[in-house]
């Protein structure tokens, strides 16, 4: 079950979405994973990379069932230029 409204359910839905991005010349790149947290059958990954060339944070939450991904939620946010930050804490 996919909760990203731009992606259809299932592996084929993910493949179709990534192919559509590639046709538009948009790359979704994960460069670094800062933490992976798990509790029960939920796993959260907090990562950084680029989306369409822009610095981006990725938060992916999966629900695992019988050893397979059963559900996925995600949040992507463009990381603002450091000169605009209101603190020195950073995104991660």
PLM ranges: what are they?
Residues 1-92:
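C-terminal and inter-domain tail/linker signature
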């Amino acid at each position: 079950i996919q909760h990203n409204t731009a992606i259809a359910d299932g592996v084929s839905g993910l493949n179709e979405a990534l192919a559509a991005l590639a046709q538009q010349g948009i790359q979704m790149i994960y460069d670094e994973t800062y933490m992976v947290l798990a509790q029960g059958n939920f796993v959260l990954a907090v990562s950084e990379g680029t989306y369409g060339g822009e610095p981006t944070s990725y938060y992916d939450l999966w629900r695992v069932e019988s050893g397979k991904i059963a559900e996925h939620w995600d949040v992507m946010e463009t990381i603002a230029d450091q000169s605009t930050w209101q603190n020195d804490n950073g995104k991660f």
